[in-house]
Every structure is written in structure tokens, then in C-alpha cells.
Amino acid sequence: DTTTKWGAERAKNGHPAPFPLKYIEIGNEDFGPVYWERYEKIYQALSAKYPDLVYIANSVIRVVGRENDDKRKDIPNFVNPKNVKVFDEHYYNSIEWACEQHYRFDNYKRGVADLFIGELGINGKYPYNLLATGAIRMSIERNGDLNPLFAERPVMRHWDFLEHRIFLPMLINGVDSSVKTSFFYL
């Protein structure tokens, strides 16, 4: 509806029709008893109004060292684990770590929640970080029965917006242009 505030903003930016939203994540890098309770309350409220959306839960942020360290082992701690359909895992680590994780998802238990790698950042110099990212992505693709979703990070950095070693906008975007990074071709 372009008569609403955000519908008008969307139309002003060249998209009068609504986007076909399928997924929504509840939180970002939230976990623990308070999150598990709040997830259920938010899930119940949203799913009552928008039953066709798929809701994504967050995983604990912990250092992962072993291939069989399935972050989804915390799902039973949610108030109602059956309401956790997709589980978001974030990974930031070294090139060496990424290469060691090539078989990581082979040992994930099946029949739990679907897998979403919402953030993957491999530290290191190009092209080695690109190749190491490929090792993780091959593991994700090889385990397609986990119904994996994947989001690459970083998308683009605008180096003119670096202030006191803090990245401000992480994305360069516009309705009239796009830039494909080397990660796009991986």
C-alpha cells in the first residue's frame, strides 16, 4: 500500500509493489534464557498475524573449533523448540579455521531446524580468504538436506566511510546499479 509511510518510501525508491517477504529473523546475535522466552512471545504474536512467513532463530555466539560442534544443540532450551524452524549461525574466523571446517555440516543431526549461515566472515588476505570461504560453502552445498540458507558478508565496504577504524555503512547500494564482488562468482 503506497499510501502508508513505508509503502510511499518504497515507491519513491522505485518499488511501488511490495517485496515478496518470505523470511523474518527474530533478533540478531541474541541467545540465552531471556532470548528463548522472548523468541516464543514474538514468534506467537507474529505467526498469528503472518502465518505464511518463516521465522528464524539465533544461535549462541561461541568459538567453534570442532567439526561436530552443532550450534543447534541449544534448540531444546527454547520455550517451544518446535517453533524453531530455521536456526541462524554466525561465523567469523581465520582462513585456517575455515579450511578445517570443510566437513563441518556432514555431522549435523538431521531433522532438527534448517540451517541458515547469516554471517560468514573469513579474516585474511585475498585470494586466500575467498578460497577458504569456498571450503565452507562446499560443506553447506554438500549438505543440502539441511535446507541451508546463506548470506555473504561483507557485501561491500565504502572505504571513504571509515572513521576511527569503525566501518559506518557496510553496503553500497542504489536502485540503478550493482557491483558483483569476487565472492559472487565463488
Predicted features along the sequence, with ranges:
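N-terminal catalytic cores of secreted or lumenal carbohydrate-active enzymes
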Residues: 1-75, 81-85
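Catalytic-core region of carbohydrate-active enzymes that cleave or remodel glycosidic bonds
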Residues: 44-45, 51-55, 76-81, 85-186
